[in-house]
Swiss-Prot record:
Species whose genome carries this gene: Prochlorococcus marinus subsp. pastoris (strain CCMP1986 / NIES-2087 / MED4)
Keyword Transmembrane helix appears in the UniProt entry: yes
Membrane-spanning parts: 14-34
UniProt similarity note: Belongs to the PsbN family.
Keyword Membrane: yes
The protein's name: Protein PsbN
One GO biological process term: photosynthesis
Gene name in the database record: psbN
Cysteine pairs bridged by disulfides in the record: none
Amino acid sequence: MQTLSSAPDPAVSVAVTILAVLLALTGFGLWTAFGPKAAKLTDPWDDHDD
């Protein structure tokens, strides 16, 4: 039985790290897409002349 003072399993640490990175990237993407600076973003399809 593990207690709170014992070291966690390395697989759990890796999984938590990967989850944290994915959540950070998702948050950054949402902030970029819908945050205050989103009004300055342009759509390349609209800028392209046919």
